[in-house]
């Protein structure tokens, strides 16, 4: 008999107990699942002699809200540049989700920002993202940051403006040339380019 119970992603103690893959799955890592997914069925089954299999196969999604684990407060598509809290690019953004999550966990507080401009912000002509949330509401709620210049955006994020501007400059060079000497990204399109005019957007993310 095989018993499937829905996992234990909301149980920090169990995550830490069985984790053999990730650098950290503590309280600072939210879950995209319901808070009710606490592994009770697994605990009860084990108590009556069930054999547990694959408990270490814990998947992370790299682009969740750091506080809630939700995915909907999102601006910026898959072509967008990702930078850490210091404003530095740290990964090939087109890597597999496990590579992206592992790279994010190595950054300060496990936090990163997706930076986008007009052509790659994933907003429709009326200002709604792909989840139906309006950009003005996201900005008002502090879920997304918006600024007319990259320097102003960096200040909102607590970064050195010069560092963010330089990261974007190098990224744009890679987009234009199709060659990314820092992280080996080879998949680019014209929408990946961060434009030289605002508004610019940033949403803070971490793995969940």
Question: Where are the predicted features?
Answer:
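A glycine-rich dinucleotide-binding beta-alpha-beta segment and adjacent secondary-structure elements
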Residues: 163-208
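Glycine-rich loop(s) and the adjacent beta-strand/alpha-helix scaffold that form part
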Residues: 1-63
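Generic structural "secondary-structure junction" signal
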Residues: 10, 16, 31, 60-63, ...
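An anion/pyrophosphate-binding glycine-rich loop and adjacent beta-alpha core
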Residues: 38, 42-44, 48-159
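A short, structure-level motif marking secondary-structure boundaries and short turns
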Residues: 25-28, 134-136, 164
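Structural signal for hydrophobic packing residues in well-ordered secondary-structure cores
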Residues: 5-9, 46-49, 119, 157, ...
